[in-house]
């Protein structure tokens, strides 16, 4: 029979049999928290903050992954932390950050880690107030530190830090930092790490019989630190850095010499300091450069160590120069900011019922803070009701355009450029009536926000002791939009005139990003105990200016015709130039010295020169202006002129801006001199001969700049080709001709043609105009060959999204009905896709053909300010060409094209969430009201946490409403997942509740109404690790209700189960809701559950935890891998239920079955016959999924709940252990 101690050991051996508690997202627990026997893992990217839980005892292993954090803190001044990690056979492994902080408490804190293996490769911070002695121990048989261990107290007391198991070994390859602390050594120390003592800290080597590896370093970081070594041990050598300025090295016995040696000796050649008590001695490698006359025997009176009278040695001089190991460099971060320790406020949206029984949505401002008893409480500060926000999208447009032929066969249409942004960029379109003999005239006017003339940036670089160097070095001129006017006119028997005005398009304001990074380096130099500190400031200044602008050329052409066909052409080409930018050097220096003397030290601070800053950008005709450098003295600046003698001895005059401060003056900027003001400078026109590569000699001319013996060609005039034999008889004129493309389409081109005798040469071909067509609707048809612009309405129906180069229509239509017509036209798209070149048709009212044109995606972007932009995406456009309608009565016809611009007609309602902690998107959409064979797209609205609900963000193409001709039912739905896992003192619920929204777009072919909506949903495990007890029960609650319409509904639920029992129940639900459910079950057969659910007119919200209207039904079964179908049908089969359904799914697992980390649900419309596997996504990402066309994709919803140790499992374990103990006894 086992003894009692053996039984205890056996129980301890079985204790690690527990689940692993995983932290996968940020979590804050305040107040009392119960801990189970379980291993804890904090995943990368997450933290767990435990606030004001005074006693934290963890049983099990701990793993903190990289980029993860664990915080245990106390904000109460009364109760300090008592933290213990106990796992005899467990592992404590930190790769991230761990903080234990009880600095706010006035009582003693205890931090104790007792485990089999301790590994630290991250950072660990232990902090306490130090009002009373604190305990900080890390005990492990396998102890390794490769990171940072920081032990801090606000003041030093007798408490000590203990590392490792007694008489064991610790391996330190990292840094162990002590601040107002005492480390007492009780183990061997191996490794190549470093112990750092700072702020009145002491390193106490209390048992030198346990060796310290020679590669270990000890750094005394300031004048108040010390190290003490036990005298009763074998002689060792300790590497000590930073000895000097009054800090101490001592023994546990007084320093007393013997007959042969004194109490201490220093070897100036090896840097070894030997300290003795008669025949006991210890060696310290302090380095070279010490003056033996500055050593002094003193007493270390520090708390927590044996104070030996005259047992220590100090050095009153400065620390000689010596290279400090990199592992001893002090980490500037002494602690980490702990989340959850400060009062916070958050906004929550909730539903409340008023006295009249109506439900309303409210937004409340909550504050979480501590009361007078230092307990965390939550209180409501402000409550405001919020309305439901409805956003109306523009309706689907059916566009009819008239393609009207002209006498010459060239179609001239009005075009416009349209931009729409959030800042209200205004577009105006004017349609000018055109007479029969005139070409179409168009006017574009794009007006944007006012643009400032100049934009200046100011860089302020603060330095030590109130010294500031201020730079205003960048002036960016922005010209207002320039306008180009051009008029083309020709005089002959007929006169054509058109005038256009085009405003240059500038962005609303220039986008400018400036990044300034400043690094301050400090270097200390100790000479004769006078510490001189130099500060050097490195400034990295970068500026990025992004501007989009266009420049238009001005073309003025006048053509004169007379009776003898002689004419002259005057070509005037004017170009509107964009503003020129040149760089001017800018150098200024500001020196300021501030001396401060004291008894101990002197500091000299000098600000650095900023001559390497980038030069400013200035306009040629804009004077340079700078702000003066601020200083404590009075400064002024003025523009003066002075004489300078150049290298050739000549005297020239320069001017610039001078900064005057007292009797000093500094040149800030020197103005560039004009070339024509330079001495000896001339400019003239000259002609010279040039020999070409073929040996011919040609004459060139140009403008020459000459100054002294130097001359430079500024401009060379273009020469005429002298090799034309008929050059003298050549005339140039504008001509239009027809060109047949490779695909057979016919287009018209025009250009300037040079003609001499029988020769014609095209000099210039005018490019085709690129524009976006605006289609206008006209109710009155026109006769062939006539353009009557007066009948065209000036309001455009829509603007197409394609870029068309040219549209040519040749009129070959006879004027009698019943004949065959040929319509030749070629609208060219960006993808070189053309409509059919020849379309032969007979006039008919019903015949039509559809030709899709896939145009380019046009992304129009306007820059608002740094870091934000507004983009407009235009979808592909489909062009439907109908046969022309011919009316024989007045010989009029219409050629109609149908454009589907893919804009859906729908209302989108944003419903606020009642779960403020959830990041789930809030999405609700209405169906497509068009016919079943209409193709369109809709935009989803996603409201982020940091986004105002009144300004939703539109994203194109995330959801698709589509129906094909083969199917009379189309379907769209979202699943907006909101999970709420309640936490009560650390206990997590394994139940699952999912709120989702079923969106329907159901239309029958006759009445265009939705009379039924069916959904299938499936529950199945995601991985093999999930254990589901077939004998257990799940309670399912699924509710659905018509959105915003209170009418009767009938619900039918079919379910197939593997095993069940006969159940018949009747349930009555309050608030005017009744439910009757009958269940028939047979062993091994299908189970059919029929539920009749009646929602009375005007029924209010259910009392269940949901804001959805309707009746909740429940069913008890064990539905592993079962499919369920829920159908909504109006009782009278006449009510249109095309809108959305609210639904709430609740799954409650009994304690023996719901032991899973992941749960996957799939909601599939009945019309989707093909079911794809759902892809599992963590619910923390709060993704929104949509069904694809024809069931190609299936929405997946995964809800992840933390695994918790259920009550029954530890009970069973302890019952099993008790039985084992009884057997052993």
Swiss-Prot record:
Residues 1-20 form the signal peptide. It is found in: Secreted, Cell wall; Membrane. The keyword Nuclease does not apply. Glycans are attached at residues 97, 200, 488, 595, 634, 694, 933, 1035, 1133, 1150, 1182, 1193. Pfam families: Hyphal_reg_CWP, Hyr1. The keyword Ligase does not apply. Its main location: secreted. Transmembrane segments: none annotated. One of its GO terms (cellular component) is extracellular region. Residues 832-852, 1049-1114 are annotated as: Disordered. It is a lipid-anchor; GPI-anchor. A lipid is attached at residue 1195 (GPI-anchor amidated serine). This is Hyphally regulated cell wall protein 4. Residues 1196-1225 form a propeptide. GPI-anchored cell wall protein involved in cell wall organization, hyphal growth, as well as in host-fungal interaction and virulence. The GPI-anchor is attached to the protein in the endoplasmic reticulum and serves to target the protein to the cell surface. There, the glucosamine-inositol phospholipid moiety is cleaved off and the GPI-modified mannoprotein is covalently attached via its lipidless GPI glycan remnant to the 1,6-beta-glucan of the outer cell wall layer. It comes from the Eukaryota. Coiled coil: none annotated.
